[in-house]
Amino acid sequence: MILVRNSFQLKFGKAKDVKAIIKDGLTKLKAPGLHEHRAYLDLTGPFYTLVLENTWDSMAAFEKALADLGANAEWQAWYAKLMPLVESGHREIYTVIS
């Protein structure tokens, strides 16, 4: 099993807007091999940070979901709402050991 963590630095003052978009978007993220997903906004650390975490059966399941979501018009429309509110981001992928 793997854990994928996507961290985004949001534009200043946009956390409230992003929160509504994320709540809507998590309902669209359904894929084979996906176990759970969570979204976090910062309490400490760099201001206006959004973290999206999800766990997958395997790297292959995650890669397939990326390809499938990229071809999904509903997901593309949701993503287009989110990206103007984001300054930058990065992804970390971990092997789950317990």
Report the location of each language-model feature.
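Absolute protein N-terminus
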Residues: 1-2, 98
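Active-site-flanking beta-strand signature of metal-NTP-handling nucleotidyl enzymes
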Residues: 2-8
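Broad gene-expression machinery/nucleic-acid interaction feature
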Residues: 5, 49-51, 88
